[in-house]
Amino acid sequence: MDSRNQLIVAILLTSACLIYCAQYVTVFYGIPAWKNASIPLFCATRNRDTWGTIQCLPDNDDYQEIPLNVTEAFDAWNNTVTEQAVEDVWNLFETSVKPCVKLTPLCVQMECNSTSTESSNSTSEGSTVPEILNETTSCITNNSCSDLGSEEVVDCRFNMTGLQLDKPQQYSETWYSKDVVCDTTNGTSRKCYMNHCNTSVITESCDKHYWDAMRFRYCAPPGLCLLRCNDTNYSGFEPKCPKVVAATCTRMMETQTSTWFGFNGTRAENRTYIYWHGRDNRTIISLNTHYNLTMHCKRPGNKSVLPITLRSGRVFHSRPIINERPKQAWCWFGGDWKKAMQEVKQTLVKHPRYRGTNDTQKINFTQPGKGSDAEVVYMWTNCRGEFLYCNMTRFLNWIENRAHPQRNYAPCHIRQIINTWHRVGQNIYLPPREGELVCNSTVTSIIANIDMFDNQTSITFSAEVAELYRLELGDYKLVEITPIGFAPTSEKRYSSAPQRNKRGVFVLGVLGFLATAGSAMGAASLTLSAHPGLYWAGIVQQQQQLLDVVKRQQEMLRLTVWGTKNLQTRVTAIEKYLRDQARLNSWGCAFRQVCYTTVLWENNSIVPDWNNMTWQEWEQQTRDLEANISRSLEQAQIQQEKNMYELQKLNSWDVFGNWFDLTSWIKYIQYGVYVIIGIIALRIVIYVVQLLSRLRKGYRPVFSSPPGYIQQIHIHKDWEQPDREETDEDAGNSIGDSSWPWPIAYIHFLIRQLIRLLTGLYSVCKDLLSRSFPTLQLIFQSLQRALTTIRDWLRLTIAYLQYGCEWIQEVLQVLARTTRETLASAWRDLWGAMGRIGRGILAVPRRIRQGAELALL
């Protein structure tokens, strides 16, 4: 019996635990969590030149950053922000420096003569004494520095149909010798074609444009955010950056395009650091600003460019030579380059990815091998719309102090046909503009590949222009805020949930929304009452900022790709917010910050640590469960709506006014009419059946005729009976006048039939009740016995529990009494001992005095 009772108690306790310890899915809206995004960004700039303002929005410098106590993965090469920067700078570059279409007709044979045999790219061995230039060197101003010869050019003539289409006309044009392909005849006159004639297909007209260095920043669309790794040890790839800040916009970035070096960058600091690709040897090295590294480029000369008309609508630019330096240019480098390059080597040795020699004497700067594209072999840069190709051989000799001619300047030449740096192909540009061209830049970075072999390390300059923008923006990443989260709680929908404390949140737009990203889940959930409003306020704020700059910039109406992308960012966040609200509505949680549900949390192995885990960490663990949880919530909401509909139908009669609503009654009136019609039809069928059965037995129908019917009705003979003397003829009239009319009797008959019908129905119902009552009585008796058994069991269980509680109470009382007595006894003993010790100490002087007295006696 005792074991049985113990088993019952255990079952009850287990059931109670299952009921009260169950975990239910709770929907939180407004959590500080995010995921990687690839939505297009929009740009903002302070430049006011024509193409800059068309391509980007005006910059208002109203941007903030807040630190987040989280860790996040960053990769400068696998990055949406840097990929967009590369693509967008290419589009800006193509927009500002347009390829020219007027050269397409020159895919014809030309007769060319060389006009100069000197080359600026001279590789002949000269003096090994370094020739170093500075701002005061005289050859800079008069263009007389050594090793700077004239460019090799060819003067070509070709025939084309001009204004008169039936008569060919001869034209003249001067080319840089490397822009044409000629035969190998030994004579002074050669047959030549334009280089890349068959691959350069251009379909738009162009004018001569140029661009200066332009800076712009990227801004996240409303509802999204930019994260930045603020760790000084970040080197382009970091799985767990410990210092993360949130921002709405990036810093300003430079749009200079060049190979080998990066110019005027915004990431240069008073130190040297290296961004290293996570999987190969590609690097971008940021140079120390302390060494003040600069590059000054110059194209001397004063050359006129005169247009000639080939035919109507086609104008070609002729280039008659005025001086002896056509297309000639050169660049000299200022600053302490040798110390800067030595610091680069020392920084490379300390880099965690470096596995080569630690001896900086065996680390050398090298240029790419011959045979590559000109943009790889030479340092390629853009100077006011002109493309310079500079031979850096003697400059590298000077840096590495090699036993070869050393110069801190490099001869350059200008080309019209260049290889595109972002896509495969060639572009043809207009001839150099007239007059002298001067460009001054600050060298801020080096694009290089690190090659380690045979205890030697080569820092090979690279032509990966895109690496410049990975250095500029590689510490950023774009994330999409995911404000909806799921977590298990013990609260069930419609249960009495405890009141949540509200905590004020400072308003920083979307950045304020992420302010608690590093807090524990329990602390962050306390601010959810303010987060959705803050989230929406941040979206509205960003939308308003974007709308304001669009209104300030009327040139936006003329945009193509960039403008469309900028305008599309205005609807991105609204769509996301409405999509989130639609999801919440499908779960029955619309416009709620914390929404309890009736869906059980089935993954008991995945439980959040509310005191130590952030929402971002929790979301990463439960992201795979989101689809199943969402589907379960939708099914629960559908069932809840069905239940509510049925309950509303039952509760509609609780309102007294609904009883007078005809629409509520008409349905039941229809049911009543159907019942009456059914009873009447059934009665008619029964009567017809009975009538047919009587006819078969020989009875005459009751309603065969009125006279027959009257004959079957009892007639009172004492009413106006005729005299016996009357004749037979008068009998009929006397009968008709002295009898009851047959319709009245028929009504009496119907009344009797109706009474009989009702009596029959009453008998049937009474019989049905009499037969059902014993069955119901048995059911009620069984139910009564079951309730009695449950009552007795509950009484017994309660008695056991009371007995157990009384026993436990007695044990506790005995324990308390024993403890109290023990402590009291111990205290008395301790107090007595302390008293004896104290009296002994107080008696010491008396004992001393007594001893002294005895000694004196």
Swiss-Prot record:
Alphabetical keyword list: AIDS, Apoptosis, Clathrin-mediated endocytosis of virus by host, Cleavage on pair of basic residues, Coiled coil, Disulfide bond, Fusion of virus membrane with host endosomal membrane, Fusion of virus membrane with host membrane, Glycoprotein, Host cell membrane, Host endosome, Host membrane, Host-virus interaction, Inhibition of host innate immune response by virus, Inhibition of host tetherin by virus, Lipoprotein, Membrane, Palmitate, Signal, Transmembrane, Transmembrane helix, Viral attachment to host cell, Viral envelope protein, Viral immunoevasion, Viral penetration into host cytoplasm, Virion, Virus endocytosis by host, Virus entry into host cell
Signal peptide annotation: 1-22
Ranges for region MPER: 649-670
Segments on the Cytoplasmic face: 693-857
Cysteine-cysteine disulfides: C43-C56, C100-C206, C107-C197, C112-C156, C219-C249, C229-C241, C297-C331, C383-C439, C390-C412
Highest taxon in the source lineage: Viruses
Region annotated Fusion peptide, chain positions: 504-524
Region called V2, residue ranges: 156-197
CDD domains assigned to the protein according to its UniProt record, in alphabetical order: HIV-1-like_HR1-HR2 (cd09909)
Glycosylation (residues): 36, 69, 78, 113, 121, 134, 142, 159, 186, 198, 230, 233, 264, 270, 281, 292, 302, 358, 364, 391, 440, 455, 603, 612, 628
Lipidated residue numbers (S-palmitoyl cysteine): C765
GO molecular function list: structural molecule activity
Entry's transmembrane regions: 672-692
Additional observations: Some HIV-2 isolates have been described that can infect cells independently of CD4, using CXCR4 as primary receptor. These isolates may have an exposed coreceptor binding site.
UniProt protein name: Envelope glycoprotein gp160
Source species taxonomy: Viruses, Riboviria, Pararnavirae, Artverviricota, Revtraviricetes
Gene assigned in the entry: env
